UniProtKB/Swiss-Prot annotation:
Major role in the synthesis of nucleoside triphosphates other than ATP. The ATP gamma phosphate is transferred to the NDP beta phosphate via a ping-pong mechanism, using a phosphorylated active-site intermediate. Pfam families: NDK. PANTHER family: NUCLEOSIDE DIPHOSPHATE KINASE, NUCLEOSIDE DIPHOSPHATE KINASE DDB_G0292928-RELATED. The lineage of its organism: Bacteria, Pseudomonadati, Chlamydiota, Chlamydiia, Chlamydiales. Its EC number is 2.7.4.6. Keywords: ATP-binding, Cytoplasm, Kinase, Magnesium, Metal-binding, Nucleotide metabolism, Nucleotide-binding, Phosphoprotein, Transferase. It catalyses: a 2'-deoxyribonucleoside 5'-diphosphate + ATP = a 2'-deoxyribonucleoside 5'-triphosphate + ADP; a ribonucleoside 5'-diphosphate + ATP = a ribonucleoside 5'-triphosphate + ADP. The active site is at H115. This is Nucleoside diphosphate kinase.
Length: 141
């Protein structure tokens, strides 16, 4: 059973879209194996997005991710990484498929509602960044 990391970003948390987004995941068959709401520090956001450190949007991304609380989740299910990415839609909400999370709730490339792991390898890294193994409940459903 695959696991992937999902983050509901500050824009969606601030607009009270948490429940709607979780419902999309659950209706697709993904299950929540771990979840918490946190307000990232600068150090945490920089550490999480370190792969983008040399990119021109890095500081803007960090500033956005620390602008309010986020909901961090481990989603579990068959093909969890790919399913989550399909549910999220394209990074740019204007290009995201109709009905996708980013089409429904995203505003721009930078303010795009959710983050999701882009590969199984990165999912493992990202999950361990936020959760200890003891915090993850393997679902039986």
């Amino acid at each position: 059973m695959e696991q992937t990391l999902s983050i509901i970003k500050p824009d969606s948390v601030g607009k009270a879209h948490i429940g709607e987004i979780i419902a999309i995941f659950e209706k697709s068959g993904l299950r929540i194996a771990a979840m918490k709401m946190v307000h990232l520090s600068v150090k945490e956001a920089e550490g999480f997005y370190v792969v983008h450190k040399e990119r021109p949007f890095f500081q803007e991304l960090v500033d956005f991710m620390i602008s309010g609380p986020v909901v961090v989740m481990v989603l579990q299910g068959e093909n969890a990484v790919d399913r989550n990415r399909e549910l999220m839609g394209a990074t740019n909400p204007k290009e995201a498929a109709e009905g996708s999370i980013r089409a429904l709730f995203g505003e721009s490339i930078g303010v795009n509602a959710v983050h999701g792991s882009d590969s199984l390898e990165n999912a493992a890294i990202e999950v361990s960044y936020f959760f200890a193994k003891t915090e993850i409940v393997n679902s039986v459903a």
